[in-house]
C-alpha cells in the first residue's frame, strides 16, 4: 500500500517498509524536520548583530547628513576630525548644493559654462569631465547630490589622499593640509572654522 506525506509544499510517495529500512527512513525524516527547525530562529536564541557606531550630525541639514553618512559608508574614514575637515571644506565650496555653478548660479551640470561646479566646485576640464564621464559609465546624475558624492570619493585625486583621512589622531589643521592637496583652494576662507564647528556637532551613535 502506498501512503503520502507532506513536507512543506512537497509530496513524497512512501512505501510501507519494515525492519532496518523503516528505521533508516524514520531517521531521514527526522533529520529533515531538524534542518527545518534550524531555519527558524526565535528572538530568545538569536545571536545579536553587531552594528558599528557612526558619526552623525543631528543639527545638520539633510544634504549634510547624507554626505556624512555616505563618507562613512564608501570609505573607512571614522575619525571625527577627518570627517569634520572634509565637511567643512564642502561647506566652503558649495554649502552642500550640488547644482551650483561658481558665482552662485543654480544650474545643471551641462549648463555651467565657466568656473567650478558642484559640491567641491570641480573646475579644471579634466575634473569637470571626470564627473560627467563617471556618471555616464555608472548611470548616475552628475547634477545630483548622490551622483556627485559617488564621484567625489572615487575621483583619483581623492583616492590618493584617502589613506591620510583614514588614519587616526590628526588635528584639524593637519587634516586641512591633506584637504589642500585634494582641493587646491585659492582662498582658504572659513573652511577650517567650519571644520571645527562640525567636530563639535558630530556625535557617535
Segments predicted by a language model, with ranges:
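Sparse, context-dependent recognition of short Cys/His-centered cofactor- or disulfide-binding micro-motifs
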Residues: 5, 81, 107
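N-terminal leader/targeting peptides and immediately adjacent processing regions
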Residues: 26-83
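Non-catalytic cell-wall polysaccharide-engagement segments
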Residues: 2-39, 128-205
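Peptidoglycan-targeting cell-wall enzymes and recognition modules
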Residues: 45-67, 94-169
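Solvent-exposed, polar/charged alpha-helical surfaces in well-ordered, non-transmembrane soluble domains
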Residues: 65-69, 73, 84-87, 150, ...
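Short, flexible beta-strand-to-coil junctions
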Residues: 1-3, 91-92
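Hydrophobic alpha-helical context, especially transmembrane and signal-peptide helices
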Residues: 76-80, 109, 175-180
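Short, functionally critical alpha-helical segments immediately adjacent to catalytic or ligand/cofactor-binding
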Residues: 80-97
